[in-house]
Amino acid sequence: QLSGNELQRLSSHNVADALRYFSGIQIKDYGGVGGLKTVNIRSMGTNHVGVFYDGIELGNAQNGTVDLGRFSLDNMESVTLYNGQKSAIFQPAKDFGSAGSIYLQSRTPKFENEERYHVKTTFKTGSFGVVNPSILWEQKIHDKLYSSLSAEYMYTTGKYKFRYQTKDGYDTTAVRQNGDVQALRVEGGLFGKIDQGYWRAKAYLYNSERGYPGAIVRNKFSHEDRQWDTNFFTQGTFKKDFSSRYSLLCNIKYAYDYLHYLADPNKDESLMYTNNHYYQQEVYASAANRFTILPGWDVSVSADYQFNLLNADLQDFVYPRRHTGLIATATAISLDRFKAQASLLGTFVHDKVRTENESAPDKQEWTPAVVVSYQPFKSIDLNIRGFYKRIFRMPTLNDLYYTFVGNVDLDPEYTNQYNLGFTYSKSFSHSWLRYIEIQTDVYYNEVENKIIATPTSNFFRWTMINLGKVEIRGIDAALQTGWQIGREFRLNGRINYTYQKAQDFTDPYDEFYGGQIPYIPWHSGSAAVNANWRSWEANYSFIYTGERYSSQANILANYQLPWYTSDLSV
């Protein structure tokens, strides 16, 4: 978890940047400065990652991805990563439904004594013409009701110099074009306290326009593709402990997403005219119940319903609608130094289309998970943990229904996860080293029925099929330390390292059978150091991504060099 001041020290501007400091994470950045930023946990694929904002999942039924670049850290209280699922069982059914989860918790107003309001303004600027002002206003309406308003604007030209070389000796320095971005984010919230509980309501709006610089092909350096996005949602949460044995958690949400993509041959003769508009709507409701059977033994039952629709102005578009029901039951036992949790999730999906085309058949799946942890020694803070989880992801609406590409006969994509690890921490009171924490995990993951795109008999027309199988073996390691040198100098550090061998075992007759899957490095890691002396503070952070390949063909032509970044702030 990254929270509070630790987030601010990392020189990160959005959630995607901050997530680079976790082990086992790959950030996919499509389109450079203004591109879509998604996250891949332990190489299982972006679609297997659930992203939750204030406890409710962010959805995208069209393509299954969430752009993390549109969530700022200026209004963020914590960013937490879970492999498998949260250790808490009191949660909506959807929280059990991902191979890995990221929880974004926005700031909750906190006031002391006679404080009535807080105001925070920031202005950031930097390379590539970045202008990034923001404001946060928190108001205490009365003792049991607070409000919050956050707004942010970001603009960048996206122009930066780069070197371009070809095999025939051509070598030049060029400036990246059509990488500009302007985006506005506004969100407001109400926070209420009730007896033995709370309620929250939030509204969020994000509006952006950006260019896509594209790849350099045959010495063509500029592109004119443009995209406009509008994302809006409003959501509410109610939680109350009715007694020491029963608690209720309810969530509700409505979301609207609009995307406009334009490729205009009047500006770029190499483009085929494309002027597409997509409209998504989502309605979601959830109720979770927790029962305390005995001290140390809890049981939860939760039920969710979600409705998604997708409209577009494409020829022969089928206008899909999806109804999803989820039921989860879970139990957790805590016996002194031993803890165990088991859950079973039922998922029921029904699709309809508004045309005479065939819709995908109904899907019904039951998927289990088991989590255990044990502290062998009472006086030593050493915890051994492990989990097994089987989960799946439904084909997205694009996978099933995209014009000329979708395939309604697709099966879900399954994952099996096995994890074994430990955490050790110790505090010291009479030495320079004040605390140390070590975490290590060894894991093995399988991805079955992997959904991929493949060309048909007409190479210019592709379709979606179930074909791939991937096996992932990896190690995540993390070290955190705190030092007190003298009375006034403090030093904190964290190091993360990941080793992953993610192999493609789709076709045993393939020349590159068993090769590392695209863009997954064998080695990656990060480091961050924070130094404090009196009222001064210095922060240094480092991110490393090792060598990798751009295709499952692990040959020299597809080789990608390692890269690293360093950030220093005072």
Predicted regions and their residues:
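Membrane-embedded beta-barrel scaffold of Gram-negative outer-membrane proteins
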Residues: 245, 249-263, 377, 383-389, ...
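Structural signature of Gram-negative outer-membrane beta-barrels, strongest in the C-terminal barrel
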Residues: 294-445, 528-530
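Transmembrane beta-strands of outer-membrane beta-barrel pores
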Residues: 123-127, 153-157, 194-196, 205-209, ...
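Short loop/turn motifs that connect adjacent beta-strands in outer-membrane beta-barrel proteins
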Residues: 109-117, 143-144, 196-198, 241-247, ...
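Extracytoplasmic beta-strand/coil segments of soluble accessory domains associated
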Residues: 16-57
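A beta-strand signature from Gram-negative outer-membrane beta-barrel systems
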Residues: 73-120
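Flexible loop and strand-edge segments within Gram-negative outer membrane beta-barrel domains
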Residues: 160, 173, 177-183, 196-248, ...
